[in-house]
């Protein structure tokens, strides 16, 4: 009996696609978006090279039928698309928890040990005596949008604690409004707000406002956060007899824009201590407006503003302005390791001379200090040095105190010289782990139906532009629309097909893509085994692609001239065990790089004077002409 006319073709298709994912050894269903892309790759890059597992793992998991139906019905079918296509979409609200809390609100219903991704109104309001405890609110979630309104308002002699709010989240939008407002007596603590978050957008409004006789401690706000913005408005405003401590705000953070407004404003008989703001931050943009303004008979202490930070832009406006009978002390402002632009406006100003204020140290470069009371203010030290002098002084201080490597500075091994890429060399390996939330590519048929504009993405994915995710979308689009640097050719790829097209356009169709095989060895010492230069170690051109934060995978790809690419076996530092296979790229022309680039901080030298090498991190990739 003769075979149906299309059967041989179908069998051939099955054989081709099942062998197509050669890099990971997995068989691919031919009726999937993944298989469709592999067929596309084979047409565009017909060199029969294996498809690397790291790239195949990023492909859409959608079935072909799903890909077709979703492409025709966005945004109506968004929820099932998010689930089936492995996208980064806003987390669904915990409606069951929200309902149970609504029943138990208004002074009871606690303590609560866990709460995830819902809006909360009135916790412990009007409570008398006893204690409230809240252990964890939305920990370790992706694309969180939470609001918490009124905690312990109008309570009396109540002890309340809040242990953790939005810790370790990805793309977190957190809004906390009113904590212990108008409360009398009692005490409380807030231990951690948005700690270890990635791309946060956090707001805290009114902490102990109009409270009476309270003792309060806020331990940590946005500690070790990465790339985002935070605001805190109103701490102890109009309070009476408050003893308040704020321990850390934005310390050890990376590229964070933060604002703190009104600390202890118009307080009576308050004892306030703020221990550290923006310490060891990297490229911070900090604004602090109003500390102890209009206070009466208060004792205010501020210890440390942007100490040991790296560049950035900071301003502090108004300290103890218009205060009466205050004793205020400010210790250490602007003592940065690498100076940024720092301004301080208004210290102890006002018509009432009945105060005593001490300022122990104001240091750094590009600083300005404007407006302070002509009497009752004692300055211990004021330094306005050049950038070079300040950097030298801070470097010597760091060495003498044993701090060879500050948290903000480039991680050991993040940048290195080409001469270090030799077999047998022992060197530090940076943390190359992918910090982005997991996502997959959208099939091109779906991606091209979503205009690459913030408003369109917001509408399709239900992401308000004033949230952390919305701001990330806006930032990604803006970076993609930015004009390229001199010698750079760039493109933002919204699908896997787009990446292949750009690489072929730049390098031809006989190409390969590489990335470091795993994260083994990250953050420790390694030894290099066999080191091989790609294309014989010749100076070449590559296409490097870096992830951008978006609901689906979007890559910023750019063609980089004058590079050498290396592959290296990565061995355990103390044995002959191979633990990884690394890919490194050396940029030979750095003349257009910024003088403040972390590479020059780590290696010395200036733009154009030294080459800079780095590993290809997990999640990123580099394309070159095939050997």
UniProtKB/Swiss-Prot annotation:
First and last residue of the signal peptide: 1-25
SMART domains the record matches: BURP (SM01045)
Residue ranges of every copy of the BURP domain listed in the record: 415-626
UniProt keyword annotations, A-Z: Glycoprotein, Signal
Tissue-by-tissue expression: Expressed in stems, leaves, shoot and panicles.
Glycosylated residues (UniProt): 119, 175, 251, 366, 384, 530
Protein name, per record: BURP domain-containing protein 12
Pfam family, one: BURP
Underlying gene: BURP12
Keyword Glycosyltransferase annotated: no
